[in-house]
Amino acid sequence: MEKTFIMLKPDAVQRGLVGQIIARFETKGCKLVGMKLMSVDQALAEQHYAEHKGKSFFEPTVQYIMSSPVVAMVWEGKNVVALARELMGATNPANANPGSIRGSFGMDISRNVIHGSDSVASAEREIALYFRPEELCDYRKAGEEWLSE
């Protein structure tokens, strides 16, 4: 089954939005298989955003992600990467659909409350950065048979 990496950024944690955002994934039938509240250090932040090194927003993004705890999660489900992208909405909350996570909670392009993998390959890379294999739970979710064929 496909997995994706989701991070609730410092603004989501500080504003007390964690439960509301998790509920959106659960309501859509996604299965939570890994989660941790953690502080991101410089090395991990730079690894996570390595593809943006050299861009003007790289350093501010690294500093921001280190400014307060984040919630790192792994979700599983059918086409979960695309589903998560739809739930999150456009990166800039001003362009996000009303009702999407960023449309509902995002303040601006920097403080948009959530990060999600943009592809299966990115999900694999990001999951490996934040979780050891033994930290992910393999289980059958009650009612799972009602959520996909």
Curated annotation (Swiss-Prot):
Name any GO cellular component annotation: cytoplasm
The subcellular localization recorded is:
Cytoplasm
| Subunit composition and interactions | Homotetramer.
Q: Name one GO molecular function term.
A: ATP binding
Q: Which family does it belong to?
A: Belongs to the NDK family.
So where's the catalytic machinery, residue-wise? 115
| Chief location of this protein within or outside the cell | cytoplasm
The protein's superkingdom reads: Bacteria
Keyword terms of this UniProt record: ATP-binding, Cytoplasm, Kinase, Magnesium, Metal-binding, Nucleotide metabolism, Nucleotide-binding, Phosphoprotein, Transferase
For activity, the cofactor(s) needed are: Mg(2+)
- Which species does the entry assign this protein to? Desulfitobacterium hafniense (strain Y51)
What SMART domains does the database record attribute to this sequence? NDK
Known NCBIfam families for this protein?
PRK00668.1
The record ties this protein, via PANTHER family, to: NUCLEOSIDE DIPHOSPHATE KINASE (PTHR11349)
The protein's matches in InterPro entries, at most eight in alphabetical order, are given as:
NDK-like_dom, NDK-like_dom_sf, Nucleoside_diP_kinase, Nucleoside_diP_kinase_AS
Among SUPFAM superfamilies, the record links this protein to:
Nucleoside diphosphate kinase, NDK
Which residues of this UniProt protein bind ATP?
9, 57, 85, 91, 102, 112
Q: What is its EC number?
A: 2.7.4.6
This chain belongs to the protein called Nucleoside diphosphate kinase
Catalysed reactions, as listed in the record = a 2'-deoxyribonucleoside 5'-diphosphate + ATP = a 2'-deoxyribonucleoside 5'-triphosphate + ADP; a ribonucleoside 5'-diphosphate + ATP = a ribonucleoside 5'-triphosphate + ADP
Which GO biological-process labels does this protein carry? Answer: CTP biosynthetic process; GTP biosynthetic process; UTP biosynthetic process
Q: What does this protein do?
A: Major role in the synthesis of nucleoside triphosphates other than ATP. The ATP gamma phosphate is transferred to the NDP beta phosphate via a ping-pong mechanism, using a phosphorylated active-site intermediate.
